[in-house]
UniProtKB/Swiss-Prot annotation:
Residues 171-250 form the Expansin-like CBD domain. GO terms for biological process: plant-type cell wall loosening; primary root development; unidimensional cell growth. PANTHER family: EXPANSIN-A15 (PTHR31867). It comes from Arabidopsis thaliana. Residues 56-161 form the Expansin-like EG45 domain. SUPFAM superfamilies: Barwin-like endoglucanases, PHL pollen allergen. Its main location: secreted. GO terms for cellular component: extracellular region; membrane. The lineage of its organism: Eukaryota, Viridiplantae, Streptophyta, Embryophyta, Tracheophyta. This is Expansin-A5. It is a peripheral membrane protein.
């Protein structure tokens, strides 16, 4: 399987860096772990002490443990969720300006995996994070209930490649894209069969992307593009014998 990492203004047009198995040539790579300034917000928690109530969610990730996101997750308010386009993004948070409840000197990094619907703290235009309880308790005491925080976007560090779970049926391929490094938030996916041209997929919901082409019996390749306009192209991720319900692993962003 060959893997190309492309920095571009328009998908497939201008390549600045290439990553092939065993080698990497620098080009448009963005160094550093953080992607934006510190911004004021608030945070609460949900899901119980074992975070079991955080499973599923509006991003479509399902079991957050098996998908590799674990306890370090958050539901985002409307202002941050961006109708699901923020799914997979990573944020660093620290509790501030509340010495009674903040645990001094600690910060956490969480992945956006769910939506916090309007109502109370999550009403627009509030910037609000509803964290899993275990990760909340790393920066604040349980009894605090709600805390002021500062947050910033950071690059996601993932183990292994981007994962593609193929659901649906013939003429309806619904692909869940998970474990995305770098910016983390997928804004575009294209796919091709070994006998077809590249085709842009449409986002169905969360991070589920669909194609209505008949691709049975063909090896499948994918292009994943994140909000920073960087892309990873993974050739022949799924073999011709692929089947619905299975997960296949491709390349990964450099960070």
């Amino acid at each position: 399987m060959g893997v190309l990492v492309i920095s571009l203004l328009v998908v497939h047009l201008l390549a600045f860096s290439v990553c092939v198995q065993g080698g990497y040539r620098r080009g448009g790579h963005h160094p550093g772990g953080h992607m934006g300034p510190w911004i004021n917000a608030h945070a609460t928690f949900y899901g119980g002490g074992d975070a079991s109530g955080t499973m599923g969610g509006a991003c479509g990730y399902g079991n957050l443990y098996s998908q590799g996101y674990g306890l370090e997750t958050a539901a985002l308010s409307t202002a941050l969720f961006d109708q699901g386009l923020s799914c997979g993004a990573c944020f660093e948070l620290m509790c501030v300006n509340d010495p009674q409840w903040c645990i001094k000197g600690r910060s956490i990094v969480v992945t956006a995996t769910n939506f916090c619907p309007p109502g109370g703290a999550c009403d627009p235009p509030n910037h609000h994070f509803d964290l899993s309880q275990p990760i909340y308790e790393k920066i604040a005491l349980y009894k605090s209930g709600i805390i002021p925080v500062m947050y910033r976007r950071v690059r996601c560090k993932r183990s292994g490649g981007i994962r593609f779970t193929i659901n649906g049926h013939s003429y309806f391929n619904l692909v869940l894209v998970t474990n995305v490094g770098g910016a983390g938030d997928v804004h575009s996916v294209s796919m091709k069969g070994s006998r077809t041209k590249w085709q842009l997929m449409s986002r169905n919901w969360g991070q589920n992307w669909q194609s209505n082409s008949y691709l049975n019996g063909q090896s499948l390749s994918f292009v994943v593009t994140t909000s920073d306009r960087r892309s990873v192209v993974s050739f022949n991720v799924a073999p011709p014998t692929w089947s619905f319900g299975q997960t296949y692993t491709g390349g990964q962003f450099r960070y």
